[in-house]
Regions:
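Alpha-helical transmembrane segments of multi-pass membrane proteins predominantly involved
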Residues: 1-490
Length: 490
């Protein structure tokens, strides 16, 4: 009989507490849910879930020291603890603002399922970022992808949600196959699936290079990098707005951090190859997404291309290939979480009070009837565009500095790195144009039938307050960046 050392689970505290939250939510839903025809909103259920998530965050806000367990397959560190806290924080914001949507007649009978699926997705992401072995990494990735597909198709009778779910499943299946193909090549080249062992054995052979390219391509689908982005706009448009917000920040942030860690851990000796590949993908992602975003008329499709562009900026930090680069990437994800979720919270609120309309024209003259929402939307868009003094400007600055620092360290591709940074700066200016199109619509354009004045729900106000404070404080308070840098440097 195999003896299990249960003390190992102490080093998996984020997963243990998250599993406890998941079990409590499941039991509470099981014993309180009514039949769909008789179902009424449970006013106590959302506060319970949010309080449990807050407790989970507070327990894990001080990351545990670096440690490997379960035969070296699972690894934790201060940096991994920070990214898990950020992902849980983003999930909490989504849960807060989801209350109004989940209490509608079409969804109130499956409120519990939403929380269970979202928590399962978060648990898979936690396993993915802590993986020190490709098997555990793949299991975590699929554990996150399957519940996410259910969330995308959650509102299957409205807004093309079923179509979006089908496209997401096809994308997930194809990308997983491509990734497994690459992992099999890497195993053939090194004879191991452990990250650290693979790092010492891997050399730039054709088999290893092909494995790296296939693995990068598979994960590129998850992050929505060009040219692996074709599913993004349709999925974002068809999924429920709350789910779209969750998919755009939490899922993307986890995959981006995991890719950064694997490129540095496993492919450190092949940095010259993956940096060239990454630079091409970054330029395409930022440029093509910006050009497509300018012509969008649907706000959720617009945010899809904005998300693709933001993914390019996030990957720019990976070129730094240092503690500064990982810090910039993590800080960018944190700022992106609060700014993007603020936008999607407003989109969800306007959609709810405007008959499901998410077209750009619906925001014409919004300032006249709903000035507070217009003001918060402007702050969030300015942060996404990198306009000072908001946090988005500092996140882009740190990303550019990390990439430039990487260029100084690596003379071989230094000139190319500076060129990519310059192109990213030019695209930042271009992105201001299409973000300001929404601001122009809200404050300047006239609307013969403007959206009536409405009072947003208390949960929407709470979510927007948290996001707005984050946009303001994360930029002004240097402690946040210092906290992340200290965790990464340990």
């Amino acid at each position: 009989m195999m003896n299990i050392d249960y003390s190992q689970f102490f080093h998996m505290l984020p997963e243990v507490t998250l599993t406890a939250v998941l079990v409590i939510v499941f039991i509470a839903d099981l014993f309180s849910a009514a039949k769909p025809a008789e179902s009424k909103p449970r006013k106590w259920f959302n506060p319970l879930v949010c309080i449990l998530m807050l407790i989970h965050i507070l327990i894990n806000i001080f990351p545990v020291p670096a440690y490997e367990t379960f035969g070296g397959m699972y690894a934790t560190s201060h940096a991994i603890g920070v990214i898990k806290t950020i992902l849980a924080f983003g999930t909490l914001i989504v849960f807060i603002q989801a209350r109004e949507w989940l209490h509608s007649p079409d969804t109130c009978f499956k409120e519990g399922e939403f929380y269970i699926l979202a928590l399962s997705t978060l648990l898979g992401m936690n396993m993915m970022v802590s993986a020190n072995h490709f098997l555990l990494f793949f299991l975590g990735l699929e554990m996150a992808s399957v519940p996410m597909a259910c969330l995308v198709a959650f509102d299957k009778y409205r807004h093309n949600s079923a179509e979006a779910g089908a496209k997401f499943i096809l994308k997930a299946t194809f990308s997983s196959g491509v990734m497994l193909f690459g992992i099999s090549f890497l195993y053939g080249a090194t004879g191991t699936l452990y990250f650290e062992d693979m790092m010492t054995r891997i050399t730039a052979t054709p088999l290893a290079i092909m494995g790296m390219v296939f693995f990068f391509s598979g994960l590129g689908f998850k992050i929505s990098l060009v040219p692996f982005h074709f599913w993004t706009a349709d999925t974002y448009q068809g999924a429920p707005t709350t789910v779209t917000g969750y998919l755009s920040v939490v899922s993307k942030g986890a995959a981006a951090f995991a890719l950064c860690a694997i490129l540095i851990k496993v492919f450190g000796s092949m940095a010259l190859y993956w940096k060239y590949l990454l630079m091409v993908v970054i330029v395409m992602s930022i440029t093509i997404a910006n050009l497509f975003a300018i012509h969008q008329k649907d706000l959720k499709r617009f945010m899809a291309f904005s998300s693709i562009s933001q993914a390019g900026y996030i990957m720019l930090a990976v070129i730094g290939d240092s503690a500064m680069g990982v810090t910039a990437l993590t800080y960018y994800i944190l700022v992106y979480v609060v700014a993007n979720l603020a936008v999607f919270t407003i989109i969800s609120s306007v959609e709810e009070h405007n008959g499901g309309n998410v077209k750009m024209d619906a925001y014409n003259g919004l300032y006249q009837t709903n000035p507070r929402l217009s003001f918060i939307m402007t702050i969030a868009l300015f942060s996404l565009g990198g306009i000072p003094p908001f946090a988005g400007m500092f996140s882009k600055f740190f990303v550019f500095m990390a990439a430039a620092n990487g260029a100084q360290i690596t003379n071989t591709i230094g000139a190319w790195t500076y060129a990519v940074v310059f192109i990213a700066l030019v695209n930042t200016v271009i992105s201001l144009y299409y973000y300001l199109l929404i601001v122009k619509a809200m404050f300047i354009k006239h609307n013969d039938k403007p959206l009536p004045t409405f009072n947003a729900g208390i949960n929407t106000k709470m979510a927007l307050a948290v996001c707005t404070l984050g946009i303001a404080i994360f930029g002004v308070c240097s402690y946040v960046y210092d906290w992340i840098y200290a965790a990464v440097a340990m």
